[in-house]
């Protein structure tokens, strides 16, 4: 359903003038005040740094209730999707709005699988990077470069081209991610295999070598598939908003997704699991936790508790519970069940959930708390953590971009500002300046 105007209005009083603003209701969640005509009526802008109280669009894709700890894709709880489905099923759901039938699922899987190869010239493109280039730098460049190789799917006004571009990115970005990893460690690229499932194929491309057979570990493949599901979309976050605002200009889909990857690279967005892992390593052992907690509580200390709390969730992150279970399974399978980091993580979580200081501040474990340990146990270096995030989030970005393109109300993004700089002044010739 689209947003509906309610009978309610909000009245803004400025001096002796009143402005009635419509209130719209969605299917669930907070109502919104429509300020679209406020500037024309009053000459006033609204001020909301970080857009924390601003709805920039209508969307039918993902719903979050941060107070209740709820995350739903197209109405389905994330717990049910992670427990019962696979990543490509979630991709279909996000793109089309409903879970696929068996026939639709097979057709969709086949289409993705047969798009995993990238143009052979991409291998030469990679050779232009330094071997020590960060994989995320390589990802931003290589995903943007897809538009040069697949210009038959860059017309955003053609629904067929939009869908082909969507299939290509879901399929090829994992291949590019694996290539970025292989390039940085000096190993040859590994071609995708059509006989493997999505997560299996990614593990194969990352860890197989030509000189010996690589056997897919089903526990690791299942865990990675679930990690992809958990990270597939998360409403209007920084990178998704970046994709939408880039797309609002009419940019091609490959450029828009590259913009999203660039935003995700920021440590405040995609690098949270790296920070959580570094924190656990710094603590080192369980006996050091009380000292660490004391520093966290000290206002004069710069020590911060990473992997706890969330910009949106004011309750337990529903993804964290699933990730915790997967973390244990992966560590057991890889022989890292006694990993000191896990012991520190478990004790730190126990203390944080029972300590009134953290309860009052609603600092609950988030998805990043356990994901770093899990990915490390799988064999991925820290530099690849955000790359895997990008692989998972690609389908969310594409779904949001497609929704924006089809939205008749969508306009080019143009935030306004509160100017606080110097007021008008006249030019002074350089010889007369002091």
Curated annotation (Swiss-Prot):
GO terms for cellular component: cytoplasm. It holds the Pfam family Citrate_synt. GO terms for biological process: tricarboxylic acid cycle. It catalyses: oxaloacetate + acetyl-CoA + H2O = citrate + CoA + H(+). Its EC number is 2.3.3.16. InterPro entries: Citrate_synth-like_lrg_a-sub, Citrate_synth-like_sm_a-sub, Citrate_synthase, Citrate_synthase_AS, Citrate_synthase_bac-typ, Citrate_synthase_sf, Citrate_synthase_typ-I. It comes from the Bacteria. NCBIfam families: cit_synth_I, PRK05614.1. This is Citrate synthase.
């Amino acid at each position: 359903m689209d947003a509906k105007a309610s009978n309610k209005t909000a009245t803004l009083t400025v001096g002796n003038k009143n402005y009635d603003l419509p209130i719209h209701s969605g299917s669930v969640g907070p109502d919104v005040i429509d300020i679209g005509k406020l500037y024309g009526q009053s000459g006033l802008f609204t001020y909301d740094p970080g857009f924390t109280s601003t709805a920039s669009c209508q969307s039918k894709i993902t719903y979050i209730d941060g107070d209740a700890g709820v995350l739903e894709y197209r109405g389905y709880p994330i717990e049910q999707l992670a427990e019962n489905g696979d990543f490509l099923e979630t991709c279909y759901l996000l793109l089309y709005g409903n879970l696929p039938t068996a026939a639709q699922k097979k057709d969709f899987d086949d289409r993705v699988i047969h798009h995993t190869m990238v143009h052979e010239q991409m291998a030469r493109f990679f050779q232009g990077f330094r071997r020590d280039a960060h994989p995320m730098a390589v990802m931003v460049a290589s995903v943007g470069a897809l538009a040069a190789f697949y210009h038959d799917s860059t017309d955003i006004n053609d629904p067929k081209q939009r869908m082909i571009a969507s299939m290509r990115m879901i399929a090829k970005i994992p291949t590019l991610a694996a290539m970025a990893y292989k390039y940085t460690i000096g190993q040859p690229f590994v071609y995708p295999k059509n006989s493997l499932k999505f997560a299996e194929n990614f593990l194969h491309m990352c860890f197989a070598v030509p000189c010996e057979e690589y056997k897919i570990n089903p526990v690791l493949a299942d865990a990675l598939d679930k990690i992809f599901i958990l990270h597939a979309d998360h409403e209007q976050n920084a990178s998704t908003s970046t994709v939408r605002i880039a797309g609002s200009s009419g940019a091609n889909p490959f450029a828009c997704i590259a913009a999203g990857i660039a935003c995700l690279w920021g440590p405040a967005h995609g690098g949270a699991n790296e920070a959580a892992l570094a924190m656990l390593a710094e603590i080192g052992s369980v006996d050091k936790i009380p000292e660490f907690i004391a520093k966290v509580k000290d206002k004069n200390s710069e020590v911060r508790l990473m992997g706890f709390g969330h910009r949106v969730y004011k309750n337990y992150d529903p993804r964290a519970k699933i990730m915790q279970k997967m973390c244990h399974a992966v560590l057991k399978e890889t022989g890292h069940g006694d990993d000191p980091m896990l012991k520190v993580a478990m004790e730190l979580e126990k203390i944080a959930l029972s300590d009134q200081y953290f309860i009052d501040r609603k600092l609950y474990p988030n998805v990043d708390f356990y994901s770093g340990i899990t990915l490390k146990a799988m064999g991925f270096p820290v530099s690849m953590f955000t790359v895997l995030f990008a692989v998972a989030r690609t389908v969310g970005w594409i779904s949001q971009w497609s929704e924006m393109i089809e939205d008749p109300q969508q306009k080019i993004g143009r935030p306004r500002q509160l100017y606080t700089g110097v007021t008008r002044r006249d030019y002074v010739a350089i010889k007369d300046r002091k």
